């Protein structure tokens, strides 16, 4: 997840949890 983009980072983290 990117630090300078909090919102997209949330989706990125969720995506990794859904598809490890």
Swiss-Prot record:
Plasma. GO terms for cellular component: extracellular region. Keywords: Glycoprotein, Immunoglobulin domain, Secreted. Transmembrane segments: none annotated. The keyword Glycoprotein applies. It is found in: Secreted. The keyword Glycoprotein applies. Its main location: secreted. Residues 1-20 are annotated as: Disordered. Glycosylated. Interacts with CRISP3. This is Alpha-1B-glycoprotein. The gene is A1BG.
């Amino acid at each position: 997840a990117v630090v300078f983009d909090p919102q997209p980072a949330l989706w990125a983290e969720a995506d990794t949890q859904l598809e490890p």
